[in-house]
Amino acid sequence: MFGYVVANIEDATDEEKARYHAAYCGLCRTLGRRCGQRCRLALNYDMTFLVLLLESLYEPPTITSKARCMAHPLTQHDYTCSETTDYAADVTVALAYHKCLDDWNDDRSVAARVGAAALSSAYRRVRTRLPRQCGAIERELAAIGQLERARREGAADEAANAFGHLMAELFVREEDLWSNTLRAVGFHLGRFIYLMDAVCDLKRDAKRGSYNPLAGLECLPQDMEVALSVIAGNAVAEFEKLPLEQDLHLLRNVLYSGIWQKYNAQFKADEKEGAASAAESVEEAASAAESTGENAGENTNAAESTRETRA
């Protein structure tokens, strides 16, 4: 389920692109230093969003430097690291380890089994550091696995809720004033990721005869767009409650546009038109959530700002 919570690079400024890649490179270096070089293979942009979000909220001391690496041996690249990067590296390892286990259990993939074995010692260390978060991963993935093995129709919402609860715990590094809001952002974003993954895989799973939680609903992938927009709107409404300044436009880029890129690429004839439509749908859903008092965001004009930047 990696690859959904990413920035729409086409709509980012040069400064934002540099910041995004510096955070990504910092996460890569931290994975190698903290968890072992093989763990750098688990690197993904989804956790870069978590780094940017928590750094914007808590503003920890940050190290900024340049370095070469195996991927870029000839040119030095900027990177940034903080205690938030350490946390995101641990979460990355935990998710990657359990993804390998899941792939092995589902497909008997030899590569997944090798990956799980390679990450096992690092995961044991991470579990010692993050018992609450790793416990949530184990508990909620077990619940999802049970639902998927039962192949019961109508279980998509239950499974999405379970993944939402998983993500909710990962968004909270420590309990404080903002824990409930961060959990709410993670919960709605987790629901979105699970259902978006099911939508994008629906046709492929049907061809393979693989289980898909949406298979029994007899709906086209495009029929899920409204539901996905509502869920994304809920995540946005909670996100806008956070007192963020640093990287705010870049974070909004991810939530208003970036999370729709795979959907737009697969189901929209014109991806740019689709991205604008999706952002408008998310804005409407966030406004609706605020007006009903369910998710009263404090900055519901974020999508307008994002669209003005596009223009």
Predicted region positions:
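Acidic catalytic motifs of isoprenoid enzymes
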Residues: 1-184, 191, 195-227, 237-250, ...
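Ser/Thr/Pro-rich low-complexity tandem-repeat tracts
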Residues: 277, 281, 287, 291, ...
